[in-house]
From Swiss-Prot:
GO terms for molecular function: structural constituent of ribosome. The keyword Ribonucleoprotein applies. SUPFAM superfamilies: Ribosomal protein S2. It holds the Pfam family Ribosomal_S2. InterPro entries: Ribosomal_uS2, Ribosomal_uS2_bac/mit/plastid, Ribosomal_uS2_CS, Ribosomal_uS2_flav_dom_sf. This is Small ribosomal subunit protein uS2c. Keywords: Chloroplast, Plastid, Ribonucleoprotein, Ribosomal protein. Gene3D superfamilies: Glucose-6-phosphate isomerase like protein, domain 1, Helix hairpin bin. NCBIfam families: rpsB_bact. It is found in: Plastid, Chloroplast. GO terms for biological process: translation.
Length: 236
């Protein structure tokens, strides 16, 4: 994997609060190598390590994107949801930003069936077929369509399992992470000071609670994905 320069600066990481970890009483000892200090009762993440692993994650994302690999971005907590949506749309990635439905990947047949039903309902709505049904039936199907749009809207164009999954909050998205581990799908994961760095294939030590921190990390990864896709087109 070729190393590239991704313009990751300490100034922008400090400004985004990437270095702020959790309360020192709520830490995971396995994060010790990524912590540089304690300040006012919280752990401070070593930004040198953050820059290194974020750069490596960007290299991985670039290479995967240049080979046409498919990405899924997962971040369902309120502070991450908007950033996840914007990042995914910008990089043309699939995303989950509301709720991880258990078995979304490990029970792919069921997910695929739901997506098929979702597509059918969207078609029926666009063609006006739903409005021609009895009111009660139309209302029920519209509620179902709304449910699908909320929970499956970000993966409606996904036709198979993703090649790489980017996870914003390891603890919040633990079920998604476990499904990736079960299926052998590589993961890039933001890890705060209360996380386990050994669970993901590529861990980025960073504040996973601050919106600015989440946005910064995702922006770097998205830029790498976009550059990788552009590289693929140029070399075609």
């Amino acid at each position: 994997m070729t190393k590239r320069y991704w313009n990751i600066t300490f100034e922008e990481m400090m400004e985004a609060g990437v270095h702020f970890g959790h309360d020192t009483r709520k830490w995971n000892p396995r994060m010790a190598p990524f912590i540089s200090a304690k300040r006012k009762g919280i752990h401070i993440t070593n930004l040198t390590k953050t820059a290194r692993f974020l750069s490596e994650a960007c290299d991985l994302a670039f290479d995967a994107a240049s080979k046409g690999k498919q990405f899924l971005i997962v971040g369902t907590k309120k502070k991450a949801a908007d950033s996840v949506t914007r990042a995914a749309i910008r990089a043309r990635c699939h995303y989950v930003n509301k709720k991880w439905l258990r078995g979304m990947l490990t029970n792919w047949y069921t997910t695929e069936t739901r997506l098929g039903k979702f597509r059918d309902l969207r078609t029926e709505q666009k063609t006006g077929k739903l409005n021609s049904l009895p009111k009660r039936d139309a209302a029920m199907l519209k509620r179902q369509l709304s449910h699908f749009e909320t929970y499956l809207g970000g993966i409606k164009y996904m036709t198979g399992l993703p090649d790489i999954v980017i996870i914003v909050d390891q603890q919040k998205e633990y079920t998604a992470l476990q499904e990736c581990i079960t299926l052998g799908i590589p993961t890039i994961c933001l890890i705060d000071t209360n996380c386990d760095p050994d669970l993901a294939d590529m861990s980025i030590p960073a504040n996973d609670d601050a919106i600015a921190s989440i946005r910064l990390i995702l922006n770097k990864l998205v830029f790498a994905i976009c550059e990788g896709r552009s590289s693929s087109i140029r070399n075609y």
